[in-house]
From Swiss-Prot:
Its biological purpose: Usually encoded in the trnK tRNA gene intron. Probably assists in splicing its own and other chloroplast group II introns.
Alphabetical UniProt keywords: Chloroplast, mRNA processing, Plastid, RNA-binding, tRNA processing
Any one annotated GO CC term: chloroplast
Membrane-spanning intervals of the chain: none
Full protein name: Maturase K
Plastid as UniProt keyword: yes
Family matches, as InterPro entries: Domain_X, Maturase_MatK, Maturase_MatK_N
Family of the protein in this entry: Belongs to the intron maturase 2 family. MatK subfamily.
Molecular function terms, GO-annotated: RNA binding
Length: 506
């Protein structure tokens, strides 16, 4: 670890040249082991200790480089178990170690840039970025003023080679990139490690950290187009995406105003009325005050950018342009829309009175009940119509564990959907979980639900299904809320982004 810290203290001009030798250092794989691999599954053979196993992983890289013609002897498919035994180690396990080591090494240049940024050595590229925890609150405050929104499914690269080519603009060590390219191409099942699942990548549990690093870097590069949003009023656009300059000098040319001085014939300034960009996983929202014509221009601008810069074919149907007043927006597990709230005002001037109609925009967020019932149906809490069922798999647990599990599920859902404007859908989920819990307890005692509740009382389940709105009301007792106001009150909790599974029903 001390050697790793000494490396980080090197001058930035030297660090790119020393990434490749780090792949042969044992402490790199120790870091990868501590961060990514599970200690309980690390050793398949009791005769190996951690140090010798890490050394074998390091030797595997050396053999793969010096004997590339014989790489099949070291990377054996899963079906050939006899040859695995002859080699004396689990090939898939050590290939996982190598990819985890790659992830540690490739993250070093970006970590150093982060340190430089924190020390004030680098200028911020974008001043309008917000934290992920503020995404929900920003959508509620900013989207209410928007008129149209583009629902974007972020495209994925056709080939992992595209990710390596993009990565070379940031990692200047050619040897490391060549070795990375070799592993991606020569690894027997590399193309099965990453699979397409709708709009996002679905990673296998093996090598998850490494491929998440590549994918996050890909998304970061995709979002580089929004460097134009640094200036809130005027931005640059091009007639053809072929005029995009190389990424390596992209920011420098913008800062030197080369666009406005040397490319007046193909680039011009245009007024951008209002733009908000929010991304979560494989989806993004681009909202604007502008007209549908402006949003369509942005749509085809993005499509051309993806195809020419990332060499990806992205179908136009991956970007849906909707009017927020007429369509619901599916994002972060919420159904959101902007509706007009009519308001009638009476104004009187001396003898005459006037009725003035006014309408204000209101941002609505609703809990999607159909996907929620489908999720509960898949988890065997109810049938496809939403009728509660018992959970036989939990019948062997104690009563307190059963009630705690059901209560924890509901509290998580209540916590996540506390930003919903109407709670009727949440109350229906509460009914399903409470009755499913009661039926599970009754099944355990081989009794009916009515007899069980009559004997123990309904209050047995009440404390485990306490809603967070009630806790909020008890905490701030000096603030008076009626039951109707509490029902319509929207509370955003900043940690809901951590509950990933609740926001991805796809």
């Amino acid at each position: 670890m001390a050697e790793f810290k000494r490396y980080l203290e090197l001058d930035i001009s030297q660090q790119h040249d020393f990434i490749y030798p780090l792949l042969f250092q044992e402490y790199i794989y120790a870091l990868a082991h501590d961060h990514g691999l599970n200690r309980s599954i690390f050793l398949e053979n009791a005769g190996y200790d951690n140090k010798s196993s890490l050394l074998i992983g390091k030797r595997l890289i050396t053999h793969l480089i010096t004997q590339m013609d014989q790489q099949k002897k070291f990377l054996v498919p899963d079906s050939d178990s006899n040859q695995k035994k002859n080699l004396g180690y689990n090939t898939n396990l050590y290939s996982q170690m190598i990819f985890e080591g790659f992830a540690v090494v490739m993250e070093i240049p970006f970590y150093l840039r982060l340190l430089s940024f924190l020390e004030g050595k680098e200028r911020v590229k974008s001043h309008n970025x917000x934290x992920x925890x503020x995404x929900x609150x920003x959508x509620x405050x900013x989207x209410x003023x928007x008129x149209x929104x583009x629902d974007i499914q972020i495209p994925h690269p056709i080939h992992l080679e595209i990710l390596v080519q993009t990565l070379r603009y940031w990692v200047k060590d050619a040897s490391s990139l060549h070795l990375l390219r070799f592993f991606l191409h020569e690894y027997p099942i590399w193309n099965s490690l990453i699979t397409q699942k709708k709009s996002i990548f679905s990673f296998s549990k093996k090598n998850q950290r490494f491929f998440l690093f590549l994918y996050n870097f890909h998304v970061c590069e995709y979002e580089s187009i929004f460097v134009f949003l640094r200036q809130p009023t005027s931005h640059l656009r091009s007639i053809s995406s072929e005029t995009f300059l190389e990424r390596i000098s992209f920011y420098r040319k913008i800062e030197l105003e080369v666009f406005t001085k040397d490319f007046k014939s193909i680039l011009w300034l245009f007024k951008e009325p209002f733009l908000h960009y929010v991304r979560y996983r494989g989806k993004a929202i681009l909202a604007s005050k502008g007209t549908s014509l402006l949003m369509n221009k942005w749509k085809y601008y993005l499509l051309n950018f993806w195809q020419s810069y990332f060499y990806m074919w992205s179908q136009p149907r991956r970007i849906h342009i909707n009017q927020l007043s007429n369509h619901f927006l599916d994002f972060l597990g919420y159904l959101s829309s902007v509706r007009l709230k009519p308001l009638m005002l009476r104004s009187q001037m001396i003898e005459n009175s006037f009725l003035i109609e006014n309408a204000s925009k209101k941002f609505d967020t609703l809990m999607p009940i159909t996907p929620m019932i489908l999720s509960l149906y898949k988890a065997k809490f109810c049938n496809v119509l939403g009728h509660p069922m018992s959970k036989p798999a939990w019948s062997g647990l104690s009563d307190s564990d059963i009630i705690e599990r059901f209560g924890r599920i509901y509290r998580n859902l209540s916590h996540y959907y506390s930003g919903s404007l109407k709670k009727m859908s949440l109350y229906r989920i509460k009914y399903i979980l409470r009755l499913s819990c009661a039926r599970t307890l009754a099944r355990k005692r081989k009794s009916t639900v009515r007899a069980f509740l009559k004997r123990l009382g309904v209050g047995l389940l009440a404390e485990f299904f306490t809603e967070e709105e009630q806790v909020f009301y008890l905490t701030f007792q000096k603030v008076s809320f009626t039951s109707g106001e509490l029902y319509r009150r929207r509370i955003w909790y900043l940690d809901i982004i951590c509950i990933n599974d609740l926001a991805n029903y796809e």
